[in-house]
Amino acid sequence: ISGTDRVFEAASSLSLNEDQLIINLQGDEPFMPVDLINTLVDDYTNNECDVITASHAIESNQDIVNPNCVKVLSESSYATDFMRIPSNEPLELLSRHIGIYGYSFETLKKLVALEPSEREINLKLEQLRFLDNKYSIYVSQYRKIIQSGIDTSDDVDAAVLYLNDQC
């Protein structure tokens, strides 16, 4: 079961309009800045897309080779691919994906009805299901520093240091 499936389960228990915007904040991204969420809402309102997500600049070569740091390839602010390790993609067109999504309740219902795509299964990236079924994904560029998500024990250690610095 994907994060999108869990969001649908929760959203279905609410009385939402079909065009109601739902923000899906991934649990492994606990340090999501409020201004990024607000930017997503604004960009969703001002751009034609089925799904909205976010990314920011890749900070190091370590990010490029880290499979837990998902990269997004985009053209004119629309995602064309997501990957864990780039192969032949121009590095200047890649950015680090941030685990947040937005979509209407109507689109969410359609997304969860889709079968997982082969690429989604192989790479364990649910957003590939959206792309592989021709759903447009607008990528908001976030220019501020954002604490990395938590995928490994090293990430937990980094999160603890980050939280200690914030106190």
Language model segments and positions:
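A short acidic, often aromatic-flanked loop/helix-cap motif at beta-alpha or helix-coil junctions
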Residues: 1-5, 59-60, 145-148
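Short, surface-exposed amphipathic charged segments that create phosphate/polyanion-binding patches used
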Residues: 11-12, 67-70, 154
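Short, high-confidence coil segments that cap the C-terminus of an alpha-helix
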Residues: 18-19, 47-50, 135
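Short beta-strands and strand-loop turn motifs
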Residues: 22-25, 52-55, 111, 138-142
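Conserved core of the sugar-phosphate nucleotidyltransferase
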Residues: 32-117
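Conserved alpha/beta core of the MobA/IspD/sugar-nucleotide pyrophosphorylase nucleotidyltransferase superfamily
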Residues: 94-167
